[in-house]
């Protein structure tokens, strides 16, 4: 059934006013008596019914208008002006003209408000002083707000709002309190989607509130009344909180008997509309039978419009009066909405859709376009309000009815296209229809009956016990778990009904076959969807215009379901296309300008920069030529954007914005209205699309200059099906295909753009929301641990201590009730957010991103055009699957899981150091993702499975010098590859931290050691092969170790001085954190040195290499410095460790000493004797070497100096022997052999050492004799100092002259040469 009727064209004009001749001719179609009976049956008076046939005059279309006018006469006793007890305009709105302090954003209709300051206050334009009154507040966010009443004399500010002054009264559902100068507990907690009714009884002087129609009881009594006392509805909101008021402009959702809305309903129009609706319903249920000459009663669901002139003329007379009424908000919601909902509730979905479809046909047929458009707009806004602010009931019946009606309306093609073009994304947020809100009060939602038995997982609270405490499940626990799971399944099935309806609605919006009268729905949706994404991508700092993330999560899942349906449907009819499992975004979409990415960052930087630097590659690889003149104009346009003249900027602003809203700050100032309450902010168009002329060469062959045809990319708002899907000469979105891309089509181009937008949605806010919802599960685990600890205490508590038993029993009850509540909420969260189906959606997006990145990488330099969010979504979606969905569902069961892990590993390994990626944030994200990846055994094995050349390239990038780049994460990756192989390096947590409260065991740093011998071997091979790889890498590691440990020592000196002051003082927590970080960096750098010297000892010990001796001397110097600082008893390090300051938990003797010991053992207790002797001589030659530091490792006290006091006998000494669980007996034996070797070698060195003249010592280190002279300046030092200096700087240490060469210098030879010359 189309809006044209049964192949006949009817218009409202044809049937509203007709000539007498026409009426006579039409009347003759049926008998006069039958027509009169029919019209009396349709237009019967509600008061007197249908008059008897003998007492009435015949009714026909000639005298019908008079009859209808008489039928619609209403005695309007209700005054539309002033009513006793009320002062102010009859149309009640928020007073945005001033009289209060605070900053607020007020919607166009002056009924919605968003807090935009610390605590802004606003009141209504009308007050009451007598009688019983009520208004409703629709809660859009559940934060800090105080809602109630105030008088005109109340003065508010940014700290004090409604309820904080005399004669102002408020209810605060966020803190569950009532306010009137003082505060007490009152009511229940509210949530987003609730409706608060505010009632004031000025006859009795009482004030009360209702939440979703349920009374919360009397809040205040003995209100001040009398002369000058009138009360205004008022609200105070904190920043970002939002509500909408209903003073009576729409039917109250929860009317209260005896209480009157502040704004009177349109009584006369309401009666007329109800009578006209009754006439319309009668038309649907009564049929003319001309053959039998009688009226036939039938079900309205069976009614069909057959083009009967009598029926059409009758409907024309009805709509002549009905159409103007259907433009009014109140009447649409009270009359039309109720009628349509009744149809949906009574019939089957198919019957309801058929009837609604025909009703919409009639609306378009008999009403003017502007009338039906206003009607549909109000209808959808009412539907959205009803859906959004409906309470959750056990069977979700309310939500199902509203969604079924929404779907029935959208099935009507003409209505759907109008709503898509003008309403769904412009006037209201259609994403609300795809949201299923989470109930805050599980009892009211019926979850207690749906899930009568609760259960929660029992997890061990101590890490390191490896599940030793994990008891087997008892029979009772197993029965509880199964009963809980059955309840969860019942809940999930009910939620799936709602989700399926939401998917069906989206399928209607994505229909691309309804192009009979204009553009198909999908292409309208694409334009609006892109603007929606632009608003949320560009409005990060403007919270009011952003779509709430919880809505985005639901919208994304429904969009993925609808998208995959259409994708696979296209594959079924086009065998050459791809299945949705193989979906990806072709790389040309990122650089051909056909899709708007707003101002989002690209991997290679700014789009304007990429277009200039890569224009040759675009021409050679993608056949896209950018006009230099247009490019220059676009660049200058971007530069001058902020310097445009004021009038032009103002005109542009007005052209881009919807109607303004009021800025409530003592006066009415224009401000862009917040998108969530009204229309979106469009923002500026992409400069690439609007100004850059792009030349496109469509054939895949080399073209001459003459064949290059210049065309301009179409703006997003102007695109048609041909612009997107293409034609025989135009590839549409896929214009500029690179040679690496296959020619076969993936799917319809429009679906590619929907997929691209879906990936962008995930990056905008979905991932953060998925992480936020994990908090419910965390709360369950915390309360479960608290309950178990309480039950353990109850079992241990002596029965004679009844006071303790009573307190423990009370705590047990509190924890049990809280767990019952949380476990039911968790069931809801798992069903709506973390279900298996939702996990598959996120996994599919991960695979889409991986394939998109792989295809983009093949384009070479054009990969830089890819938006950054593709890489971030690949990283974040994997993190979500592992950390958010993993505890509920097993990742190993995902299809192709191992292959996906390997592909992601290859991407991280290749691109973390990719020069085509310039953004600091995305490079850091890639580095952190790779660092996390190598911490878990299954993902580390995936790294080992990538091709060998990629593994070697990754390790080569890890071994690049640390200077001029972020190196901490790189070093941490190398440490993780070594952890489990180093000396005493098999711990998960440090030994001294095991007894403290555990952290999250899922953290990467708390995973069990899983070293990679394969990657270690690659590292060893690279360090051996490259002549300059090892020196530059180790020089940078030694430099960073010197810096990190020096910073650490400097900071603990400041901390120690602050701790020793007598006056009260505080140490900055940030300083403690930086101090601990420097210590951790020092330990990790030492571990990298240990790994290097273990894998490739010849780098330090093969002195045939030019840098080996220098590196060994530097290493020995640093090791001795660390040992001296850490091992001296009662020194700075010892005292700070003893303080055990919060934030310095990781600072301890063990981690840094075992790292140093591992290096020393490898140098002195392994390898041939020649290498050992070389290492020993270098170590002993360092002036900072002290044998007591080595003895300290085994707990041996240093010899007492003459006259020194004996150490305290109860002092606990550090010793590696005390860590038998962490250090093996073989390792301890190696330390003992090392100590014996050094003891003997130091004794020999002491006997052989000769005194040295101070003038002959190196002026840089004052430790070694001068042995080198710099040319041409002639300054001198020891070889070790100048070699180390030249690793980083070529200027002279003393005079800054450039050093050309370094020559050996011998004092005796120099002296003799001088004497000879003399």
From Swiss-Prot:
<dbReference type="Pfam" id="PF00622">
    <property type="entry name" value="SPRY"/>
</dbReference>
<feature type="binding site">
    <location>
        <position position="1281"/>
    </location>
    <ligand>
        <name>Zn(2+) 1</name>
    </ligand>
</feature>
<feature type="region of interest" description="Interaction with NFKB1">
    <location>
        <begin position="972"/>
        <end position="978"/>
    </location>
</feature>
<keyword id="KW-0863">Zinc-finger</keyword>
<keyword id="KW-0479">Metal-binding</keyword>
<keyword id="KW-0963">Cytoplasm</keyword>
<feature type="binding site">
    <location>
        <position position="1261"/>
    </location>
    <ligand>
        <name>Zn(2+) 1</name>
    </ligand>
</feature>
<dbReference type="InterPro" id="IPR001841">
    <property type="entry name" value="Znf_RING"/>
</dbReference>
<dbReference type="GO" id="GO:0008270">
    <property type="term" value="F:zinc ion binding"/>
</dbReference>
<comment type="pathway">
    <text>Protein modification; protein ubiquitination.</text>
</comment>
<keyword id="KW-0597">Phosphoprotein</keyword>
<dbReference type="InterPro" id="IPR001870">
    <property type="entry name" value="B30.2/SPRY"/>
</dbReference>
<comment type="subunit">
    <text>Component of the KPC complex composed of RNF123/KPC1 and UBAC1/KPC2. Interacts with UBAC1 and CDKN1B via its N-terminal domain. Interacts with RIGI (via N-terminus) and IFIH1 (via N-terminus).</text>
</comment>
<dbReference type="InterPro" id="IPR043136">
    <property type="entry name" value="B30.2/SPRY_sf"/>
</dbReference>
<feature type="binding site">
    <location>
        <position position="1275"/>
    </location>
    <ligand>
        <name>Zn(2+) 2</name>
    </ligand>
</feature>
<dbReference type="InterPro" id="IPR013320">
    <property type="entry name" value="ConA-like_dom_sf"/>
</dbReference>
<feature type="binding site">
    <location>
        <position position="1258"/>
    </location>
    <ligand>
        <name>Zn(2+) 1</name>
    </ligand>
</feature>
<feature type="binding site">
    <location>
        <position position="1278"/>
    </location>
    <ligand>
        <name>Zn(2+) 1</name>
    </ligand>
</feature>
<comment type="function">
    <text>Catalytic subunit of the KPC complex that acts as E3 ubiquitin-protein ligase. Promotes the ubiquitination and proteasome-mediated degradation of CDKN1B which is the cyclin-dependent kinase inhibitor at the G0-G1 transition of the cell cycle. Also acts as a key regulator of the NF-kappa-B signaling by promoting maturation of the NFKB1 component of NF-kappa-B: acts by catalyzing ubiquitination of the NFKB1 p105 precursor, leading to limited proteasomal degradation of NFKB1 p105 and generation of the active NFKB1 p50 subunit.</text>
</comment>
<dbReference type="GO" id="GO:0005737">
    <property type="term" value="C:cytoplasm"/>
</dbReference>
<feature type="modified residue" description="Asymmetric dimethylarginine">
    <location>
        <position position="687"/>
    </location>
</feature>
<dbReference type="InterPro" id="IPR003877">
    <property type="entry name" value="SPRY_dom"/>
</dbReference>
<feature type="region of interest" description="Disordered">
    <location>
        <begin position="459"/>
        <end position="481"/>
    </location>
</feature>
<dbReference type="InterPro" id="IPR035773">
    <property type="entry name" value="SPRY_RNF123"/>
</dbReference>
<dbReference type="GO" id="GO:0051604">
    <property type="term" value="P:protein maturation"/>
</dbReference>
<feature type="binding site">
    <location>
        <position position="1292"/>
    </location>
    <ligand>
        <name>Zn(2+) 2</name>
    </ligand>
</feature>
<dbReference type="InterPro" id="IPR013083">
    <property type="entry name" value="Znf_RING/FYVE/PHD"/>
</dbReference>
<dbReference type="GO" id="GO:0051603">
    <property type="term" value="P:proteolysis involved in protein catabolic process"/>
</dbReference>
<dbReference type="GO" id="GO:0006511">
    <property type="term" value="P:ubiquitin-dependent protein catabolic process"/>
</dbReference>
<dbReference type="GO" id="GO:0061630">
    <property type="term" value="F:ubiquitin protein ligase activity"/>
</dbReference>
<dbReference type="InterPro" id="IPR045129">
    <property type="entry name" value="RNF123/RSPRY1-like"/>
</dbReference>
<feature type="modified residue" description="Phosphoserine">
    <location>
        <position position="679"/>
    </location>
</feature>
<feature type="compositionally biased region" description="Basic and acidic residues">
    <location>
        <begin position="460"/>
        <end position="481"/>
    </location>
</feature>
<feature type="binding site">
    <location>
        <position position="1273"/>
    </location>
    <ligand>
        <name>Zn(2+) 2</name>
    </ligand>
</feature>
<keyword id="KW-0488">Methylation</keyword>
<protein>
    <recommendedName>
        <fullName>E3 ubiquitin-protein ligase RNF123</fullName>
        <ecNumber>2.3.2.27</ecNumber>
    </recommendedName>
</protein>
<dbReference type="GO" id="GO:0000209">
    <property type="term" value="P:protein polyubiquitination"/>
</dbReference>
<keyword id="KW-0808">Transferase</keyword>
<keyword id="KW-0862">Zinc</keyword>
<feature type="zinc finger region" description="RING-type">
    <location>
        <begin position="1258"/>
        <end position="1296"/>
    </location>
</feature>
<keyword id="KW-0832">Ubl conjugation</keyword>
<dbReference type="Pfam" id="PF13920">
    <property type="entry name" value="zf-C3HC4_3"/>
</dbReference>
